[in-house]
Design a protein with these regions (language model features):
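Short, polar/acidic, helix-capping and beta-turn segments at strand->helix junctions
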Residues: 1-462
Length: 462
């Protein structure tokens, strides 16, 4: 052949393609497939009430400043017009106005955003307007979901922003824009991760990750000829998208996940999907004997791999994630908080999207406790920053929204803590302490059904 590759006897199919999953995640997938959880949904026993049906959807813009962060939440603009693009333009104007009036920053200081759409049909239109907010490299990390009628009558878009009030030169970003075998390139104007200084460590905001195959940028699925069930395809996607989160976290030197949200879409077998997501999350935070033995094995350096003909030895050894770093955990609890949240739609028609907050730190203390209406987990980072997750059990649905408001007031009224509330029930119009993410259902650890889940970020109480 005339080509250089032909003269060398190399064909495209001879070039090594990395496996889709690393060793640790491949092992986790095999374990899931070997013992699938029982499929037992309980939607029939749930109340039919949701935010749209309640007639009490009245989202108020919320602003909080704490821990060097300024959060601006629940911005809508139905008055700008019926079209999603028009409303995103209205939201952009409101965001710029708030930032300019404060004198505390500009849109260049936004490090994370949550975009809630009425429908994913509007994804491309909203993306075009949203991109106009950010002119510099490393735009904010982002999570985008569709909530349907839960946004309220006439509302096509709602956006919330996290603004870093610290020096710009101390931020770090990861913005992957080209295809590779490592992790998906972004499918919109966002960074995969943004990292900011928090005390003596760093907070790392990771964009929502869906199960795209990095090389093709198509949703992962098993070969149809293999006769795989929806369950096997879903398990592949839930593991792959979590691997994306892990790889980005590792690249950003995350030591520990403060918490994670597994956004789910679809209508059938949702309890099973939530339990599967929990099981893989738990699995990846279980330290086994093999990992402890790995710590004592010598690591091959680059010379050995390239010139010492020991690359195969390195390739055969199971890849173990650098996350989690158990050395920083100063408590018996070892699995970070987890919520699974059912929404109407996710980007690209995905049925799973992982979104997490990581930290680079020297010390983490995790304290679980039972409270009046459910369960609470406090995670204190470097004795400075507190991340709290509160679960309100489905059996306490009758206390929402009044009881939920009391919980928020208790934690936020005098501390300027920032709250994110995931719920299928209406909140009072006076809710002004944080961000609302309306959803169809929510689960916590072990796939327990919840009436609401609350995430709080604040300075550790003195």
């Amino acid at each position: 052949e005339d080509s250089a590759s032909g003269r060398l006897g190399i064909r495209p199919e001879d070039v090594r393609r990395p496996e889709l999953l690393d060793g640790a995640f491949e092992g986790a997938l095999e374990e899931l497939l070997a013992s699938p959880p029982e499929s037992e949904d309980i939607e029939a026993s749930m109340e039919n009430l949701n935010l749209a049906d309640s007639g009490l959807v009245d989202y108020q813009v919320s602003q909080t400043k704490n821990c060097g962060l300024w959060t601006i939440s629940n911005i809508t603009a139905p008055d700008a017009g019926p079209d999603a693009g028009e409303q995103m333009n209205g939201i952009a104007r409101k965001a710029r106005s708030l930032l300019e009036a404060s004198g505390n920053g500009s849109t260049d200081d936004i490090i994370f955003s949550t975009v809630l759409l009425h429908s994913m049909v509007d994804f491309a239109t909203v993306n075009g307007v949203y991109a106009s907010l950010f002119k510099r490299p490393n735009p904010p990390a982002r999570a985008t979901i569709a909530c349907g009628n839960s946004l309220g009558e006439g509302v096509k878009v709602m956006a919330s922003f996290v603004v870093d009030l610290g020096p710009r030169d101390r931020r770090q970003g990861l913005h992957v824009q080209s295809r590779s075998y490592w992790a998906p390139a972004n499918i919109g104007p966002y960074s995969q991760a943004m990292s900011i200084v928090q005390g003596t460590g760093r907070l790392v905001y990771i964009a929502g990750q869906i199960p795209l195959e990095p090389a093709s940028m198509e949703l992962a699925s098993r070969s149809p000829e293999e006769g795989n069930s929806w369950f096997e395809n879903y398990e592949l996607r839930v593991v792959l998208s979590l691997q994306h989160l892990w790889r980005i976290g590792t690249a950003m030197q995350v030591d520990w996940w403060l918490g994670v949200i597994a956004f789910l879409s679809g209508e059938g077998c949702m309890d099973t999907k939530a339990r599967v997501a929990w099981h893989i999350w738990e699995k990846m935070h279980t330290r086994n004997d093999e990992e402890m033995e790995e710590d004592d094995e010598p690591v091959l350096d680059a010379w050995d791999i390239k010139y010492g003909h020991r690359g195969d030895e390195q390739a055969l050894k199971p890849a173990l994630p650098d996350l989690p770093n158990f050395a920083v955990v100063q408590s018996n609890a070892s699995v970070p908080p987890f919520f699974a949240v059912q929404v109407k739609e996710l980007p690209r028609g995905s049925d799973i999207e992982w979104q997490g907050l990581g930290c680079r730190c020297a010390r983490v203390e995790i304290t679980p406790m039972e409270i009046q209406h459910g369960h609470q987990v406090d995670t204190v980072v470097d004795d400075d920053f507190t991340y709290t997750c509160i679960e309100i059990g489905i059996e306490h649905s009758d206390m929402v929204p009044q009881g939920l408001q009391r919980i928020i007031d208790t934690h936020c009224l005098h501390t300027e803590a920032h709250a994110v509330v995931y719920t299928r029930y209406p909140l009072s119009g006076s809710f002004t302490h944080g961000q609302i993410v309306p959803c169809k259902a929510i689960w916590s650890q072990e796939g327990r059904r919840l009436a609401a889940g609350i995430v709080l970020q604040r300075k550790k109480p003195s």
